Regions:
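A short beta-strand micro-motif
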Residues: 1-10
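Generic detector of N-terminal low-structure segments
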Residues: 4-5, 26, 68
Length: 69
């Protein structure tokens, strides 16, 4: 976000939309999609890699059985 706002401010002062502005705009959108996917996985308990499951309470299960009694 820091780099995005820095580039955005420089472009505004210059008065033109250059290649860097478009690149950081796309990068910002890509990060938003990534964080949306990760948040959805955290809420719904979707396995995200190699059998690991992250639950909505933040506990990460790695295939072993946890007994909470």
């Amino acid at each position: 976000m820091f780099f995005y706002t820095t580039i955005e401010n420089q472009v505004r002062n210059d008065g033109s939309r250059g290649l860097l502005y478009d690149h950081f705009d796309d990068l910002n959108a890509a990060y938003a999609k990534l964080y949306t996917i990760l948040a959805a996985a955290a809420v719904s308990g979707i396995p995200y890699h190699s059998g690991h499951i992250i639950r909505s309470d933040g506990l990460i299960l790695d295939g072993r059985v946890f007994d909470r009694r």
